[in-house]
Amino acid sequence: MITERFAGLRADLAFIAHWVTPGSRVLDLGCGDGAMMDYLQAEKGCTGYGVEIDDARIPRCVHRGVSVIQQDLEGGLAMFADDAFDSVLCLS
C-alpha cells in the first residue's frame, strides 16, 4: 500500500519495490533524486545507500534523508564489503 506521500512514485519503481524484502539492506546504483530509497526506507524499513554521479541530484537525495554517495560507478564499489547488501538496484 503506497501512502499519500508516495502517491506520485513511478509505477515501475513501485512494482520493483514490491520485490524488495522489508528491512533489507539496499544499494541503489544511479539513484537519481533518491525517490526509490526514500520509499524503501519509509515504507519497507530498509536501510542502505544510493550512488549517483550527477552533482545536481545529490541535494534532493539528502533532502529526502537518503544516504547518498556522489561517485562514477566506473570507479567501482570497493568501499563496500562483499555481502554488504541484500538487494542491489540499478534502474533508469
What role is predicted for each listed range?
Residues M1-D83, S87:
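Conserved N-terminal segment of class I S-adenosyl-L-methionine
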Residues C90-L91:
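A short beta-strand submotif of the Rossmann-like class I SAM-dependent methyltransferase core
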